[in-house]
Regions:
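A generic structural signal for beta-strand entry/edge sites
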Residues: 3, 29-34, 92-94, 122-126
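A mature extracytoplasmic/lumenal domain signature
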Residues: 39-41, 71-74, 101, 109-111, ...
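Short, surface-exposed beta-strand/loop "edge" segments at domain boundaries and coil↔beta transitions
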Residues: 15-17, 42-47, 102-106, 132-136
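N-terminal leader/targeting segments
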Residues: 1-31
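Aromatic/basic-lined ligand-recognition segments
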Residues: 78-116
Length: 136
């Protein structure tokens, strides 16, 4: 097994993810179409999940990314309301961010049944990045 880390090297909008075990790059006509990854090497406890997500959101905010579609998909936060929503296996959390007219991303947090630790609440984070589609 080998783990990878995304270093998004845009001079203005760059950020770095934690190590990932799941990491895919999509191509069309030999050009990168998008990246999909899970910025973790195993399903995480809720506290650890929030640390990863909040760090990524801080990096994006500091690099000039802005949250979009916030009426329906507000940024994640470490609040009792968000914790309850993430614990609900039928809800989870999704956020969208945009970097000018260049890029968009979607981050999803989902409850995950981990057969290695069946008595623990574990979570998966999925991150997808692609060129901006103009969604505000």
């Amino acid at each position: 097994k080998s783990d990878a880390r995304l270093r998004f090297m845009d001079p203005q909008y760059g950020f770095v993810t934690p190590l990932a075990r799941f990491f895919t790059v999509g191509f069309t006509d030999e050009k990168v179409r998008g990246v999909r990854m899970s910025p973790q090497v195993e399903p995480l406890l809720l506290d650890d999940t929030l640390k990863v997500v909040l760090d990524l959101q801080d990096q994006w905010r500091n690099a000039g990314w802005v949250p979009i579609r916030v009426k329906d998909f507000p940024s994640l936060a470490d609040t009792p309301q968000w914790r309850a929503q993430l614990r609900d296996v039928n809800k989870g959390g999704t956020v969208y961010w945009r970097a000018g007219d260049k890029y968009q991303l979607m981050l999803v947090v989902s409850r995950f049944r981990d057969n290695k630790r069946p008595t623990e609440e574990r979570y998966l984070i999925t991150l997808g990045i692609h060129r901006s589609r103009g969604v505000q």
